[in-house]
Amino acid sequence: MRRALLALSIPLATTALAQTPLPSHGPAKGYLVITGGVPDYKNFLALAGGKDAHIVVIPTAAITGPGEKRLPPYCSAPGPFAGLKCTVLHTIDRKVADSLKFVAPLRDATGVYLEGGRHWRLADAYLGTLTLKGIFALLDRGGVVMGGSAGATIQGSFMVRGSSDPDDNTIMMAPGHLVGFGLFTNATIDQHVDARGRENDLAPVMKAHPELLGIGLDESTSITVHGDTLTCNGPRRAAIWDGKDHYGKGYYYLRAGDTLNTATRVATLVSHPPDP
């Protein structure tokens, strides 16, 4: 049975770093579903309107070159959005991404799915364009954006693992590719943490930028961000890097049902069985 919630800064005995962390904010009206790699279609589609959803898929991060044509059947069987109103948008041409014709499907969309791959491709194609403005407008209407892996990291304001030349995602801070979409402000997001042994990879980023809220997602974990509330949906963990020392680590874990006020950095935890 779910026990009483405990509201506290975890842990109580922490040491703040010299620079005070800044508040982080998600969309005031809309929602972000951010996953460590495995898509959370259930929560995404529920927030997008269920059978009445209009989904826009942006697969750009996964497309390796102009000749790439082998895309999954997102909008048709057996794809995840079969039977729904669904549109695929892709370009690497910034002029196209900044055109009214290209962004037209976003005007009445209720959900955007950002495919995984290399998030620098998303940044290069869409930062500063009408496409990104259309995504923000969708959130202002109460819509939802979901992304895992690259589609997770791009949602933050500070982009890690963004190196394009060389194309090396072990480089945590790549000059020229540090700016994400900023759907989640003053935040940086890492992914595939448990599957790829990335538990401490955010440490140098947080040392250089202690004002940020850092989030490290296990591969099967999703979080939902709405306003100043981050909810961990599970089933695994979300590591929260909040600029404090937590018994020798720079982070602590949220699990399914736990929430975080991203403005105050106060976590609200539920009772969980011990890890096996």
Report residues per predicted region.
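ATP/NTP phosphate-donor binding region
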Residues: 53-105
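Bacterial N-terminal signal peptides
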Residues: 4-15
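A general structural motif
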Residues: 29, 50-53, 109, 142
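Class I SAM-dependent methyltransferase SAM-binding "motif I" and its flanking Rossmann-like core
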Residues: 115, 121-196
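C-terminal and late-domain segments of enzyme folds
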Residues: 19-51, 62-69, 76-81, 159-276
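A short, aliphatic-rich alpha-helical micro-motif
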Residues: 106-107, 139
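Extracytoplasmic/secreted cell-surface and envelope-processing proteins
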Residues: 64-70, 96-98, 120-124, 154-156, ...
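Structural recognition of the beta-strand scaffold that forms the well-ordered cores
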Residues: 33-35, 54-59, 87-89, 111-115, ...
